[in-house]
Amino acid sequence: MAWLLDTNILSELRRSRPEPKVLSFIETLPLEHMFVSVATLAELRYGIEIITDAPRRADLNAWLTNIIRPMFDQRVIPITEDIMLKWRLLVEEGRKTGHTFSQPDLIIAASAAHHGMTVVTRDRSQFDKAHVPVINPWEP
């Protein structure tokens, strides 16, 4: 099984004291079965760039550049034409039901749907509404 890690999973693992349930779950997964979307990397970059504390921003930038990107080398899901076509269908499904999706989450959902992956996230609601397999390691 392939797992697509949401931004909040990587952020949680960066914390000085990550949630033990999340650590336990991630430790059960083979690294080669874990993937990230390029949208996740963009969300991380955005979060880093808005930090006003320069030393903290530099530390997080080093984490992204020297740890996360190399760790997921060859396992970053790009945004392709097929993923964008799936994204557009999901946008339309949401419109018909009166739901507006978070765009980074919807791109991640479209990526998971296209590649047959399960999303690992704390915020399942967007992914449930997009009808993609999702697991929240914070839940029992």
Regions found by a protein language model. Give the residues of each.
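Active-site phosphate/pyrophosphate-handling residues
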Residues: 8, 45, 106-107, 133
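Short, well-structured N-terminal submotif of metal-dependent ribonuclease cores
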Residues: 1-39, 49-66, 140
